[in-house]
Amino acid sequence: MSEFEDHEGNGTVADAIYDEENGGRDGEIEDQLDSKPKRESRDHERETSRSKDREREKGRDKDRERDSEVSRRSRDRDGEKSKERSRDKDRDHRERHHRSSRHRDHSRERGERRERGGRDDDDYRRSRDRDHDRRRDDRGGRRSRRSRSRSKDRSERRTRSRSPSKSKQRVSGFDMAPPASAMLAAGAAVTGQVPPAPPTLPGAGMFPNMFPLPTGQSFGGLSMMPIQAMTQQATRHARRVYVGGLSPTANEQSVATFFSQVMAAVGGNTAGPGDAVVNVYINHEKKFAFVEMRSVEEASNAMSLDGIIFEGAPVKVRRPSDYNPSLAATLGPSQPSPHLNLAAVGLTPGASGGLEGPDRIFVGGLPYYFTESQVRELLESFGGLKGFDLVKDRETGNSKGYAFCVYQDLSVTDIACAALNGIKMGDKTLTVRRANQGTMLQKPEQENVLLHAQQQIAFQRVMLQPGAVATTVVCLTQVVTEDELRDDEEYGDIMEDMRQEGGKFGALTNVVIPRPSPNGEPVAGLGKVFLKYADTDGSTRARFGMNGRKFGGNEVVAVYYPEDKFEQGDYGA
């Protein structure tokens, strides 16, 4: 059968041809349809694989970055540790160097302190005392200024309460701590104990015309030693004598023994039995001494010993440079007693040549080659000389360049000083003045010390009469002003000062400070401070410990006050 016969009855030839053609194409389509999902699947698998590769790559990148960060941090930590170790080493090195340097400095300073021999300590104490005095003066000035000024600042401060811390830091108006001697003396008096008799003090029996007191005398068991010590300081300049021309072998003991024996031999001991000399200071380099006597009168009697032979050579007895004749005249005799037996020690009365007194002239700046006759001739051009002394070196006999003289006519003293002072003598310039002129500048201060001592003695005499009885109330007068009491802040400060200072002496039970009346009515006891103690032990210590102190620049006067009047509120007694 032919090819066409197979399709016979099923269609035309065209259909057969069509079937043949399409039959082959359908196979291809089927093949295509079968391969597409496979391709898509393979593509998907490849894409998935690539995605996984990319994810793995990203993970590896992150791991590398993390490892890098960890490594970097580790390196940073190592670097910081290294730097820290370096800093520690540097710090240790600096500290060792500093300690070594400080040790060397300390050793050097310690050696210097040993070489200075304590001079720095003395300078420090003097500086500290000067600072203390300046601070004390400043406190007095501030309190005085506060009492004179009622400024707006004070009014503003008055409205504010004072804090406890501020109160603690406030400086007390009192100038210094209570003297220990007053505390001890008062304590012994209260308990009925008599303090042991002190050694004989120089100058006992001073102020004979005003208040004679033998050494160690007391009133009612109350020691007068603080007053005696004060008078000793005030009279010391008049109780010392200058002794020049000493031998190299002289010492304090030999000088004191010699002059004590000589004073007894001539009848110059006027202060009672015992040695007239209480202290000796020797300058071995310049061969002179200051000899301190017990009394002003004995020092004046010692002036008659000028030229006496001591250890084989004559010595000069003079007044020291700080001697003030006008002030000494109020303390005792300024001239030797005319009844001294000078012949007993080989002296002739008047041998000193009249070189004492306020009209003695000092002549300094003399050329060393000037002889005694040349100097005397120069001075006598103004009048006759009552006494003359050219000071010479003991060993060489050469002039020391200065002299002393006294004119017979005392009226020419100032004329000669004015004419000769400042004259050129070769390469020297003369200095001519009264010998005591340098100390006259100290007269006001010395007189103040003397006046203060006299006032204290007179006050003690009044307060320590046999009828005076200690009470538990102490009244302080001359302490505060009316203006200070009007101001609330000032009043509070004063009250606090009194409580603090008064409490140092005993159990303080009450403090009363009367204040001015707002209506201007008179108030009893204005300007006084009343301290009430639990017993007379505390009041007695306060009485002697606060008397003479300074509060805000005012000198405190402390007296006992009747207990019955205090309890009644009567402060005007």
Swiss-Prot record:
CDD domains noted in UniProt: RRM1_U2AF65 (cd12230), RRM2_U2AF65 (cd12231), RRM3_U2AF65 (cd12232)
Cellular component, GO, one term: nucleus
Domain annotation RRM: ranges: 239-322, 359-437, 478-564
InterPro entries according to UniProt: Nucleotide-bd_a/b_plait_sf, RBD_domain_sf, RRM_dom, U2AF_lg
Biased composition (Basic residues): 94-105, 159-169
Gene Ontology terms for molecular function: mRNA binding
Region Disordered, residue ranges: 1-175
Location(s) in or outside the cell: Nucleus
GO biological process: mRNA splicing, via spliceosome
NCBIfam families: U2AF_lg (TIGR01642)
Protein function: Necessary for the splicing of pre-mRNA.
Swiss-Prot/TrEMBL domain comment: N-terminal RS domain has a very strong bias in favor of D over S.
PANTHER family: RNA-BINDING PROTEIN
Protein name in UniProt: Splicing factor U2af large subunit A
Native source organism of the sequence: Arabidopsis thaliana
Gene that this polypeptide is encoded by: U2AF65A
